[in-house]
Amino acid sequence: MVNKIFIAIIISILVSFVISPMAKNIYSDPDLSKTSRKFDGFTIDFRGIDTPNSTYWALCNWQMDLTEFKKTYPDATGGGAYGGLQTGINVKKAIMSFWEIHYKENGKDKILRSNRIYPKGSESTFGGEGEGTNYISNFNWPTNVWHRFVLHSWKDSSTGKTFVGEWIQNLSTKQWTLFAYFNTNLENSYITGGLSQFQENYNANYFGVERSFQIKNMCL
């Protein structure tokens, strides 16, 4: 890790919304003012306590640094990313997603997308709040058990591109799982941005129920 800065945070939030058809999001924004804001890794411990259907816990929202890319394409925008854990309809999942990077080349609009390297398979894309590439898959993480969520970026030796991976550890069994990693198709990039978290009810059919979670032990 670039910065061995431990942020002792534990948040326990209990939410019940019985009027609004969509539960309001709950955000956590770490104070990064005393860091370099240039990271090759991020970890956070998470425990879901009340985990009803259609809940998403964003464990890190970050930005891929575009400094090197903007030397050639100064108008480039985008490059956000996020990862976390989710409940679907009676199923649990994990997520890793990268938004597109938009730029112009010889006056023409261009798009740079991240490519999934692991696990192998056809590319999955998403729309709605912007467009990009993602991987969402069943991941049976147990309720009321602490999990360690880890992001790591590195320069791939064969391509020279910046790769980013997502690992999840069950802290009860000590078992690690490599969930996914992507080629960002950027060079000399790294993890930056706000590194925020949030809880979201994304399906109006499942409002009005309690949702609670805890987070602690952020490390950059």
Residue positions per predicted region:
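Short beta-strand segments enriched in hydrophobic/aromatic residues
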Residues: 46-50, 100, 153-155, 170, ...
